[in-house]
Regions:
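Short, Lys/Arg-enriched N-terminal segments with co-localized hydrophobic residues
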Residues: 1-10
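Short non-domain terminal segments
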Residues: 1-2, 28, 56, 62
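Extreme N-terminal starter segment of soluble prokaryotic enzymes
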Residues: 11-15
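Active-site beta-alpha turn of Rossmann-fold NAD(P)-dependent dehydrogenases/reductases
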Residues: 18
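Glycine-rich N-terminal loop/short-helix segment of MobA-like nucleotidyltransferase
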Residues: 21-36
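Short, function-defining helix-loop hinge/capping sites that tune catalysis or transport
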Residues: 26-27, 40, 102-105
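Short catalytic helix/loop segments, enriched in acidic residues and glycine
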Residues: 32-48
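Phosphate-coordination/substrate-recognition cap region in phosphate-metabolizing enzymes
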Residues: 47-160
Length: 162
């Protein structure tokens, strides 16, 4: 039997922040991997998040972010608020939002009417039931979005891949 005793452990903090409201959030559209701008409200939300972090007086060692503009812009607004440089951002496409496949760009309420509220909920929240794949010809497909040009083609999803 082993007993380990550690007298002093200084625990760190993990801060998780979702991006501020995007233009497509405002329009109630399935966004997923499409690169959309923050809305004015989203920019305010990011600055408020920065103020909260500033009040907590955390020293932050690493900043991780998805490839998505709305997330990067949210983080940059936070960093500006807490007076940190934005050259410390580590981007990883694996942190991107859920991919909504063929639902991308469609209105959520209209899809609830068409597919039923329960089915839309399943597509939005389940781990094992992805929406139909997005056509590779769609302008919303990640293969057709400049942001994702560096991701190996075989890793670019057509729909959610949790």
């Amino acid at each position: 039997m082993y007993i380990f005793y550690i007298k002093y452990i200084k625990m760190g903090h993990l801060i998780l922040i979702r991006h501020g409201q995007s233009e497509w959030n405002l329009q109630n559209k399935f966004t997923g991997w499409v690169d959309v701008e923050l809305s004015p409200q989203g920019k305010l939300e990011a600055c408020k998040a920065g103020e909260l972090i500033k009040e907590l007086n955390f020293k932050i060692d690493y900043f991780f972010c998805s490839y998505q503009k709305r997330s990067i812009d949210t983080l940059k607004l936070i960093l500006n608020t807490i007076r940190e440089k934005d050259d410390q951002i580590i981007k990883a496409w694996e942190l991107n939002e859920r991919h909504y496949g063929a639902l991308t760009g469609l209105n959520k309420d209209e899809m609830k009417k068409k597919l039923g509220e329960e089915q839309v909920h399943i597509f939005r929240r389940s781990w094992d039931t992805p929406p139909e794949p997005l056509s590779k010809n769609s302008p919303y497909h990640p293969l057709n979005i400049e942001t994702y040009k560096d991701i190996p083609r075989e890793k670019v999803p057509d729909t959610e891949s949790l």
